[in-house]
Amino acid sequence: KLVKEGNDVDWLSIPVRELGVGHKHTVMAEGGNESFRYAFDLFYSNKVGVMKGSKRDNYGGGIRLQYNLKNLKFSNYASFDHLKSVNSPYGSFSSYLYYNPYYNPYDENGNVKKVLYSYEYYDRGITSKTMYNELYNAVLPSKNQQTSNNFLNNFSIEYDIIQGLKLKANLSLSVDNGKTDVYKSYENTEFLDKEKKGSYAQSTSNDFSYDINVILSYFKSLKKHFINLGFVYNLQEKQYDNTSIYVVGFPNANMDHVSICLLYTSPSPRD
């Protein structure tokens, strides 16, 4: 019947972009004199994926300062990086490999159909089989994205206290945080046989670390003999905080906040 209707749908082209254009911009500058130097850079890049709706936005920058004042030298470099990745609402490309060209994803009014095809057959009784439309899930409210932020600061100082006696110190500071959000509408075909429809999975990570390194050294030459003394102090700390939640049951497709749910639960292996 479907073949006679004359449908010839190129399913593999539906979730794929015809043309993807990305761009990248960078600005750099430096200057100063013998006692003071500076440099900074800013960047922004946008990359679009092969699947419709997928993209990666990345921006950030850094600044470097360096001072040379007689017997005192110190420098500092600070940088920030932000990345946001958005996955395609069309799901996995492999899902479209199993659709025959005579399956029409649209009804007579041009609306996306929820069910592509259903039929009944006899197997120790009457059994029905239904094939759902992956494109239907693509047009529903959804969210599948990751964001991350990274801040890094490196500070170093070098001081010649007296001839032969030198102090060096370094401080490294790093702050990282990330967030992942995956929301599926209660109308998604995944929840047809489930009591609690709609789901939201959210995970957050917050990492903090620092590293302090201090070196005090003394060197002196006495004719054929040398005196070399050193003191090293190192302090490190790393903190990790990761949280994951999975909630189900959303009364409205446009209510996509984790607090608007009926139940906190754990995802099944297939989720």
Description of each model-found segment:
Residues P15-R17, K24-V50, G60-N68, S75-Y77, ...:
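Predominantly transmembrane beta-strands of Gram-negative outer membrane beta-barrel pores used
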